[in-house]
Amino acid sequence: EDFSGQAIMVSHSRDEIYRFAEEVIMLQEGKVIGQGETKEVFRQPKNRQAAILTGCKNIANAKKLGEHSIFIEDWGLELTMEREIPDKLSAIGYRAHDFVPLCSGEEENAVPVKLLSKAELPFEQNFYFQPEKGEGEICFLVQRDGPYGKMQEIPKALQLREEKLLLLTEEN
């Protein structure tokens, strides 16, 4: 409170950065890969490495199909969206707490999955799935006191909400 100047804080703790820094600059091998207001950079990182640094657990290769559609190659899923897709799209990011668990894979923008493993923790459950039509792993984290904390069944699909989808490019 008594200090009126600016300071540079170097940290490897994303929680510390989010809590204390109004603005952030992310570096990788001496190059800036993300910068701006901290909350905005965490909300919408622009590229794969920045998404990883902000804690995004689900990053998958993707390509633009049209002005409003993409194909998530790693998950075998085509999505149609209202927003325009950037030409240089290379991947998507999706935060592990943001999925909507479904009992069937028939819903729009849902990836059918099969359970690989599950971890019970004091305050959350961690689910690790494999997409039925793709490769890789999808992490879904459920807070015990959250909206899905009392889930009775293992989800058969995970729905992606457009407003939560991170469209990542290789450029900053």
Residue ranges: model-predicted function:
Residues S13:
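Two-component His->Asp phosphorelay active-site signatures
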Residues E23, Q35:
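Short, glycine/charged-rich "phosphate-handling" switch motifs in NTP-dependent
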Residues E37, Q49, K63, P112-K114:
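Residues located in well-ordered beta-strands
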Residues K39-R43, A51:
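Short acidic-hydrophobic catalytic motif
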